[in-house]
Amino acid sequence: IFLKDTIEGVGCIERDSVQATGSDILFLSNRGLMSLGRLIQEKSLPLRDVSKNVRSDLLELVGFESAPIKSIYSPDNAFYLLTLPSSNTVYCFDVRTPLEDGSFRATTWSGIIPLSFSDIANDGFFMGMSTGLVKYGGFLDGTATYAMSYFSQPLDFGDTSIVKFLKKFNLTIIGGAATTAVLNWGYDYTQNFSKQSFGFLAGNIAEFNVAEFNTTAEYSGGKTVNTPKVNTTGSGNVVTIGVTSTINNSAFSIQKIDILAKTGRLL
């Protein structure tokens, strides 16, 4: 055993945050969730902060954490989980493909406090809770529905001095059968959002009578791609948008949000 290289200016602050993800290693530092993969492959490049888009919120919760922080990487689900028991929060990082800035997509799970994790090949992903063993899967919280909420950071479209007049949102959503969602938008850092609901019909399987040997002939199935269009109003220099929905045993994945807007000037 010999020392081949050293990394200065950063350290792991939680032993159980270290996870190998194939060709990469993730760990929690006082600068965020760090990736070693880029440094291992090309030594001239620095460590990569894969939590940069949520770094401030993440490190604030880490600073208040008094209980042991646990983590796990699930190859089948392609996510890295980091649990913060004191704040009743689990950070979930999607490790499939980094964003253009090198960070991972991140979301939080609230209302659960996993005490342990186990990812069993060909059997599923499990979490140990104070109430028992929980298996991850499906689109219900046990037998109950749960809320999904996505909000962007304030958007200035490249120039804060120009007034934006939002006209229409074109969304691309996978799934959402028999679901009602709400589009939220607000101007100039307000938390009092304008809202417009939109919904999807239940997906039906196409059938043509009954097959000869007493079986049903199926011609379509699977998840549906929905492209709702929502008209919007108002104006401001900075825009925040969001989508909320109640997940009720059906997939709901926001793929794209296109914003149609006009610009103007302050007089």
Where are these regions (language model features)?
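A short beta-strand motif characteristic of beta-propeller blades
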Residues: 2-7
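Beta-sheet repeat architectures centered on beta-propellers
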Residues: 9-15, 19-24, 30-267
